[in-house]
Amino acid sequence: MSYITVIDDKLYSSLRKLVGYSPLYLFNDKGDFVEVMKNSEFRFLIPSGYFSNSNVPLYGLTFSYGRNWMKDRQKIILPELYPIQRRVIEEIILQFSRKCKEKRPLYTTLHLACGFGKTVTASYLIGTHKKNAVVSVPNKLILKQWENSISSLKVSYYVSYEGVSKLLKVLTSKSFSILVVVDKHFSNKEFCELVYENYDVFILDEAHIYNLMNESIMTSFLCYYPPRICYFLTATPRQQNAVYCNSIINFIKFSPLQKILYVIRELYNEYTNPSIRAHVSQLQTTANKYHLYTEKALAEDIHRNKTIVDKIIETFKTNQGNRILVITKLRNHMIIIYNDLRKVLSDKVYLGDAQKKSTTDMIKELRTIDNFILVSTLHYAGTGLDIPNLDSLFICNTVMNSMQSEQVMGRICRDTGSSPTRSIYLFINTSIKEIKSLVGVFTQRFAQQATKLGFREVSQMA
């Protein structure tokens, strides 16, 4: 259970500063998740992770680290790490030794660049603790990636592909040193209690997905069943989440990669059709709050789509890009681009369709292929896609927030020892006049973020 207290002025100021002075929400002692107001007389639950920072007073609290040792810990084989990854481990050990002396919670956010190898690094940490561990991921698509990494430790593990009910039945007769689960498992109270009693290490993968100032499964778990040792893994941390994990290790990876950003500029005559006109009519309505109709109209821009397809084919045929990822926002746009590419490049083109069960096996196959084009959606491939050798990224959609942009760029920024060149292709123009300005603004915003991440911009006329 978290620390329960009335929040005085000093604590209130500290918590508000931590969340960037945005509204502060916590559970009160009645179990209600409410906004914390200054001088409130309610008692609130302060998450354990808040006390992980040495600048925070402990109010006489001490934290223990559990005794749930792996029964097969003598079998552990730690994975090989790159020098930069070993530096992260050394920094964590140094920080945790200080926390142990002060009896603080062993919590930290690992802010590591996309392509750093967070999964391998976290697996190494699990192995060094030698205590039972649970890894939580936001969706099933990432489970296989974790299984590949965890299995190398050579201790017992279970990856829960079939839901929490099946897992609880399995755990009645068997125990495992490591569980890898989807976050929805934590909606089950019995599972939360089991984890709290039997597992000491908790890994929250893709922590940026969760806004812990909102009431959610993860907010409840971290507050009412606080892990003894906890890692948040992310390339793009949320400031609001610092209340739950108030310690961070920030490593920027220096690499020899040559990063090039191509902004393709082609002028088009205006184009429309009945479907586009229907989408355009929704642009100024609340239905377009998340630019859904902007993307629907853009997906039907036949002139822009032709430019994209032609550039992909040219890049692939001239060996400027050998392992290409093509990203769309909408599924129908993905299929349009895929079909057009297949007409020319046939079996070199693959479809990353989240609706097909065979996609997971296909992704695994692509890790062993030297020349391919994968067409997928931002939802499927933007976070957690495990194909380390990608070298080129084509962005077909236009509207992304900064977190999504950085995540998708990370798909091609892994230093795998192959070709040192990494390329991004943006398409800044459209033939649909009603969205032309917006497409330009969002594309330029993406380009600005790419340059901050080390990409050198080159303008090209198609």
Curated annotation (Swiss-Prot):
Job description of the protein: DNA helicase which seems to act as a postreplicative transcription termination factor. Involved in ATP-dependent release of nascent RNA. Forms a stable complex with single-stranded DNA, and to a lesser extent RNA.
Source domain of life: Viruses
Compartment(s) of residence: Virion
The enzyme's E.C. designation: 3.6.4.-
Motif DEAH box mapped to chain: 205-208
Domain Helicase ATP-binding: 99-255
Homology family: Belongs to the helicase family. Poxviruses subfamily.
Record protein name field: Transcript termination protein A18
GO molecular function: ATP binding; DNA binding; helicase activity; hydrolase activity
Keyword presence, Transcription: yes
Residues noted as binding ATP in the record, renumbered to the chain: L112, A113, C114, G115, F116, G117, K118, T119
Any single Gene Ontology cellular-component annotation: virion component
Domain Helicase C-terminal: 308-459
Record's subunit section: Interacts with G2. Might be part of a transcription complex composed at least of G2, A18, and H5.
Major location category of this protein: virion
Organism listed in the record: Fowlpox virus (strain NVSL)
InterPro entries: Helicase/UvrB_N, Helicase_ATP-bd, Helicase_C-like, P-loop_NTPase
Keywords attached to this entry: ATP-binding, DNA-binding, Helicase, Hydrolase, Late protein, Nucleotide-binding, Transcription, Virion
